[in-house]
Amino acid sequence: MQLPDRLRRLIGQDASWSTDHEGASGTALRVVSGSKVFYVKHGPLASAEHLRLRWLHGRVPVPEVVAFEDDVLVIADVGAPSSEAAAPADIGAVLGRTLRMLHELPVTECPFDGGLPAVLERARANIRDGLVDPDDFDADHIGLTPEMVYERLLATRPHVADLVVAHGDYTPSNVLVPASGEPVVIDVPALGVADRYRDLAIVHRDLSEDHGPTAWEEFLSAYALVDHIDEERMYYYRLLDELL
């Protein structure tokens, strides 16, 4: 990765770079420079995340933006494990309280569009660019092609939406749990105004698979923003996630 001169000086010439970290991906690098630890991302998603982190600052706990230049984002290490790694006994309640905090933000103040038309277009582009691996689909979708999933999404599109400021990828790995203080929300390039079920479907899938029905019940109790679950929208947004 080519760093702008200012960012190179900020990080330091002798910094150690690694992709070996929790939630490692090709777009996030962990950088250790003396006593400081940063995460560095680059590209269009880094630019999108930078804008969202700036907006979220002071509204919900998020990592500190250290610097941003030429589509390169430098974020301070929070120094805390994800709820997925820490697996606290009350993980459902932790995730429920944190998502409630996000979903209670006024949608009229959020400048980012996470609505279905924009997300379906992103899904279509992912198929076109060969970025969807059907081998990673949930068990009940094995055997479907990405094109079949997309056609099903178009045919069963919900006619209602309960709009909130949605994370867009609300999984246990994207909520950090410091030893003290509030949980910290990370990886927010997809954040925007969207149906709350975009988040509920994903966290339900992960909690149910890894922690069982009790964790989901504890989540709902702590979240406390819905009186009943719309199972059709839960399924729809889980299906949509296969293409994202």
Question: Where in this protein do the model-derived segments appear?
Answer:
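Regulatory N- and C-terminal appendages and interdomain linkers associated
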Residues: 1-12, 49, 242-244
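An alpha-helical support segment within catalytic cores of ATP-dependent transferases
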Residues: 3-6, 104-168, 226, 230
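ATP-binding glycine-rich phosphate-binding loop
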Residues: 8-33
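A conserved alpha-helical element in kinase catalytic cores
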Residues: 25-27, 35-102
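Protein kinase-like catalytic domain
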Residues: 57, 99, 103-107, 208, ...
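Active-site Asp-x-Gly
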Residues: 162-165, 178-229
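Hydrophobic residue at the +6 position relative to the catalytic HRD Asp in the kinase catalytic loop
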Residues: 173-177
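Charged phosphate-binding loop/patch that engages nucleotide di/tri-phosphates or the phosphate backbone
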Residues: 225-244
